[in-house]
Amino acid sequence: MKQKILFIDRDGTLIHEPSNDCQVDAINKLEFKKYIISSLCQLMNFGYKFVMVTNQDGLGSKSFPRENFNIPHFFMLNIFRSEGIIFEDVLICPHFLDDNCDCRKPQTKLLKPWLKKNKIDKQRSYVIGDRETDMELAKNINLTGIQYKEKEFNWIDITKEIIKRNRYREVIRETKETYIHIKLWLDLEHHSCIQTGINFFDHMLEQLSIHSGISMYILAKGDLQIDDHHTIEDTGIVLGEALSQALNNKNGLSRYGFVLPMDESQAKCIIDLSNRPYLSFNAHFKHKMVGDMNTDMVEHFFYSLCCSMKITLHIDVKGKNDHHCIESLFKAFGRALRKAVKIEGNTLPTSKGIL
């Protein structure tokens, strides 16, 4: 399995860089950037590993003796370690810019051992630094760069951005009866494209996407010449799998979501990301079809989704119009899901230690 790596600059990003000489060569010059400890802990909980990459002009020279560098540097590493934050590697270029070496950022020599391993998840690994040279380094190793700016884009902002990009999944399921391809982004809104061949079902999934705040790409091809059963069932299975995988790390999750009556149809939905599949479905429809969708498949869709997502779901609706009832169910589920997947902290939302 490929590893998510954050290649992080030191001076100006992890710790303050002195403006007078740009050297952290004494304990009293060591100052951590705001929110750095809590942010790295949160990112670590999402499976990230850290590599420090730093240019230290003239390290080992008379103007910057290595022993002067080592004291605050190892003190810094020990503080990180005391909070459970471990750097897998510390890569240091000791040269001046005029030395024209091939290891000074944005050159890539220091990182070649990491790149040769071919075990980096390039879609979800980043270079983080405060300088343009850090962004150039990111480009040179084909990773996304995130520039730290203390007043405009600090560690809280960086952490939110990484987690937002991290909660993405793509799942494809192909059988003799259907082909289902789903991509979703839990923290990206209003970028959905849904095509199942069932117009009313498309409309319901669009409502789910809008009200959950989850962008969805859904392409479903099934044996609609027979009926809509396999297409709707397998869409529910794959959507549940994609949501479950995107929520693989549940640290900080709200976990629970609920909505009370909405619209004239009085839809209720209660959700628990419990890892225990269970569905309580209370709805009665007057007609066999709404548009081109069989109303019997509404419950079966939620059942398929519950089983593959491994959630506990209670949904209830009352109303006179089948269209409004079904639509309010999807809206209510979306609203409840929005609350349940929201990140509110750093800890696992259970006393069991596993979810």
Curated annotation (Swiss-Prot):
Pathways per UniProt: Amino-acid biosynthesis; L-histidine biosynthesis; L-histidine from 5-phospho-alpha-D-ribose 1-diphosphate: step 6/9; Amino-acid biosynthesis; L-histidine biosynthesis; L-histidine from 5-phospho-alpha-D-ribose 1-diphosphate: step 8/9
CDD domains on file: HAD_HisB-N, IGPD
GO biological process: L-histidine biosynthetic process
Region (Histidinol-phosphatase): 1-166
Cofactor: Mg(2+); Zn(2+)
A single MF term (Gene Ontology): imidazoleglycerol-phosphate dehydratase activity
Annotated EC: 3.1.3.15, 4.2.1.19
Active-site residues, Swiss-Prot/TrEMBL: 9 (nucleophile), 11 (proton donor)
Region (Imidazoleglycerol-phosphate dehydratase): 167-355
Keyword set, alphabetical order: Amino-acid biosynthesis, Cytoplasm, Histidine biosynthesis, Hydrolase, Lyase, Magnesium, Metal-binding, Multifunctional enzyme, Zinc
InterPro entries assigned to the protein according to its UniProt record, in alphabetical order: HAD-like_sf, HAD-SF_hydro_IIIA, HAD_sf, His_synth_bifunc_HisB, HisB_N, Histidinol-phos, IGPD_sf, ImidazoleglycerolP_deHydtase
Catalysed reaction, written as an equation: D-erythro-1-(imidazol-4-yl)glycerol 3-phosphate = 3-(imidazol-4-yl)-2-oxopropyl phosphate + H2O; L-histidinol phosphate + H2O = L-histidinol + phosphate
Pfam families linked: Hydrolase_like, IGPD
Keyword Zinc assigned: yes
Family (UniProt): In the N-terminal section; belongs to the histidinol-phosphatase family.
Stated name of the protein: Histidine biosynthesis bifunctional protein HisB
Source organism of this protein record: Buchnera aphidicola subsp. Schizaphis graminum (strain Sg)
Annotated gene: hisB
